[in-house]
């Protein structure tokens, strides 16, 4: 299968210029620095995925914030110095957020609102203009985690317009596009967009969710004291998922899933792999990881299994997360297994 060259082994810089507690210049200037990029390169990574929220790049009226673009430009420069590539992910745009903690957000409106979409395209025009001269180093991801199943046709339409826009500015840059339902691997097959040699299909994988997000405070249904190991039986994960989330939407419920292990990931990746092969497109996993609350042995086993599938099919990937956000590779909670994590990565 086609590979996303230069983006095979990455890590996310979540929590830096996205998902921050408050708009704080001191935080932006210190959370990620050149030393972090140098360290990431020393670990053998080939790229970083850089989530950025719209309000770092523009004010509420849509006026450009030069210092916000400066963070991206500094990061690109550091990455160039240490031999890393960079994926710019617009984590939130004006009028849309995936964040479950933003309970008043209308997650449908953006997909049917011409004014909101026009602002989205204006911002992306500015981003593309600034980074068009680095087509082999800087890739573009239009928007993080479209939540609702029901907007899939509208999302395909927006993606088609986005690709046309970016191609008019940066014809050789990689564009990384994902499906609905939080960028699920199950919805890659629903993508229906114009393709060329620099389009990449993208998904996120936190399956089984009751394991990777056990005790997650931002999931309203999840008990804070819930714990479960890995691997367990498919039946146990399905039972716990239904008890907690009251649905059967997770990939663990896919037909043909009979056991946990590397075969589980091969099975749930299968439709996405088929779609990518059919369209001659590389496949990429932009987020995957395990919450710090899981036991260490289970974290390692899960990481080994998902990486076995990544490597078998040549799927590029970016671990969530480098620092903090309850998944941080360099955090104290991962210290005792960090070296083993790095060996698997």
Language-model regions, residue ranges each:
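Short conserved micro-motifs at the rims of enzyme active sites and ligand-binding pockets
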Residues: 22, 211-215, 321, 329-330
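Short, surface-exposed loop/helix-turn segments at secondary-structure junctions
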Residues: 27-28, 217-221, 298
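Short, hinge-like loop/turn segments at secondary-structure boundaries
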Residues: 67, 104-107, 192-195, 218-220, ...
